[in-house]
Amino acid sequence: MFRLLSANTQQTLRPAILSKVRSNKANISLPSSSIQVNPPSPAQYNLTCQFTRHNSSASSQKTKSSKVDAFVNKAQRDPVLREALDSEANSKLNYFKEQLSLAFQYRSAKDRDSQRAFVATVDNLFKAFEDESLRSSYSSRDLYSYTQILNFSVYHNRTNRLSSSRNRDSDQYQNENLHDEVLIKSAVLNLSETIISGEFNKILNANILSYLFYSMKQFQLYPEMLNLWENGVNDGETGKLFLNEKILAVILPIAYEQKRFSYEEILHIYELNTKELSTVQHELLCSIGKIAIGSGDYSRGLDSLEALLQLYESKQQSTQHVLASLGELHLNFIGSCKDIKISKHFFDKVVQYDLPYYVCLKVPYIQSLLQNCFELNESLDNIIYFWKSTITHYSNEKNSAGLNSRYSILNNTFFTIFFKIYPTLNAESFNKLREVIALYAEIKPVDEVFLNTIIGNYSWGDKNVLEQLIENYSIYNVKRTPVSYRICLKKTGELPQYTNEDILIKWNDSLQHLDQNGFNYIPIADWAALRDATILSNSGSDRKDFYLAVANQYKDYIQDQRSCIRFVKYWLKKREHLKSFSTLTFGSDADFSNEVDIVVPQFRHLKPNINYQKISSKIIGK
């Protein structure tokens, strides 16, 4: 085992390895002080008399403490009272175990009711965990089951959020996934802090820590992970647990990415903890291989891959888990390797299904591959090859529609690069964009996410081309959500060729879509799109009065008081616009001069929901 010391002179507090201790052969202790301080004996302060106020806080605390001690002593002697206390403790523990059992049952069910029941059960577990007296009765099995459910909750919530066809707009403040995510994250941090406190030292094991670190990694709580690990390593009671191969497999890549250790230091830690092992666990082999690839040491990365293949053939460890590690390391050769020839070799093996093991082509690795290609000045044709092959691979999978987010991430990365390679409009760039759209349409139906991504990244500044892109929603019969209308409206803010009349048409189109889909309010996200298209655009001075006139007509259509307060507080930060904005609160219709005639249509669902002037006047003030 080794010690980690923090250097006071460095802001990053980089730890240094000082030593390794195995089987308690060496110990590190604090240097003894040269000054001996002896506590004074009570006789030195023997006062002849003491004065005590019976109503003093000290007296009160002493009395309360005495009562508590007396109660505890009585409880220890009174079998009836003791039995009652034990019964309550057992009831709490039984309830906790019952909730764990229910959570395991619900997590495997796919129906909506079971998923809701799972969330409610997990919430009960989080609340029960807050009881310190209950935690003291946990067994290792109880804590292990809790961390399993906690880790599954992280994964379950994240999958639901990313696979949903709905976009998590900022105005949807009652979003269930967002609410659950906050609770789960708090529970993860709470467990971490409880472990750091030493409360679970007697029942802690490597499997418990592994699940906790997995959960923290999902939330990208990297500083907290390193803090937990360093505290554990330096704890004489639990130090060896935190140097377990499973734990090192999770923490070493994080420590390297966060520049906590250099590549050489990582290798040293690895060698110190594996030199006496006959076989290294597959997780750690995978991790050291990933770190090697990230540092450019491809030879060692290939050595790790070969070691995993040998481990798979030997069947010394779970073949399923070894194959998962092989797949993970394979992905790192695709996404982390800066030699594109090597990356392409591993990429082709996946998309051509030419492997003895399965590799799930995760989009962050393809995202990284595309970025590496751009940074290394690869041709656009090569970038298109990787992009097109990935889209084809995804569309051929059974759950091709399962995770909409991966198409969004992939397309966003690709078109960000596309418009960097072609920053201006010309015949070549225009034809290339048409070619890309046609390629996508050959693989899978053109969808809203695809067109949203193109329009969102569009940077040529030509109104006619942008309108042609927008027409594709109709050409390809794309089912639209409010998001696409907002993106199109917002994009007009970047092009001065759009008149206020043009912007009003797009605003009305967005409202018509909301009304047709049963909205009875205008979401904050639509107000933000209008704001970015007008008053906060590069043409803001020419569109300011228009924005205020539109806002005046529709200000009571905001969702509710909470949304209204949020809307107003945004403008309080924009001091340069606050005087004009306050006209919405204290002005009348006559104060909004505008050359465009703004007429509110007859809606079926959209309607006034608040008294804007009444609410905002309490915030702004004259």
Swiss-Prot record:
Presequence range in chain numbering: 1-108
GO biological process: sporulation resulting in formation of a cellular spore
Membrane topology reported for the UniProt record: Peripheral membrane protein
GO cellular component term, pick one: mitochondrial inner membrane
Entry keywords, A to Z: Membrane, Mitochondrion, Mitochondrion inner membrane, Phosphoprotein, Sporulation, Transit peptide
Keyword Ion transport: no
Annotated compartments: Mitochondrion inner membrane
Post-translational modification: Phosphorylated. Phosphorylation promotes binding to RNA.
Superkingdom as given in the UniProt entry: Eukaryota
UniProt entry tagged with the keyword Transmembrane: no
Record-stated family: Belongs to the RMD9 family.
The protein's role, per its UniProt record: Binds the 3'-UTR of mitochondrial mRNAs. Involved in the processing or stability of mitochondrial mRNAs.
Subunit field text: Monomer.
Protein name: RNA-binding protein RMD9, mitochondrial
Source species of the chain: Debaryomyces hansenii (strain ATCC 36239 / CBS 767 / BCRC 21394 / JCM 1990 / NBRC 0083 / IGC 2968)
UniProt lineage: Eukaryota, Fungi, Dikarya, Ascomycota, Saccharomycotina
